[in-house]
Amino acid sequence: MQFFSTRDQNRKVTSSEAIAQGLSNEGGLFVPESFPQVDVKALCQLDYPAMAAAVIKEYLTDYSQEFLTEATRKTYGEAFGGKAGYLAPVEGDTYALELWHGPTCAFKDYALQLMPKLLVEAKKNLGRTEKTLILV
């Protein structure tokens, strides 16, 4: 899948390029050129790591399925105490999605724990070897 800049729709890049670059040269965000259809009923049968891999693979088409499966398993496994994407029953058919089971007890863990793995793989996909410093 290609991603284009919000400031120049003619500027298209792969998912690896978008992740490695962050922002477009014009200062825009990279957005997917389309939004794939997914089988929601099939997704409901998966645990959170498998569901994440299934959705992400539709967008990050230059990443291998094996890498995405392993990355989501490692990311949403032990660090989330087995409760990644946990739906807590409230009452009857009402549930609350608990987003605080990550290592820092914040919703941001869902993205920020996976992103470094995606960045390292993006650099491999692009043949880039320079060091990257991530400030947290």
Features from the language model and the residues they span:
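PLP-dependent amino-acid enzyme catalytic core
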Residues: M1-V136
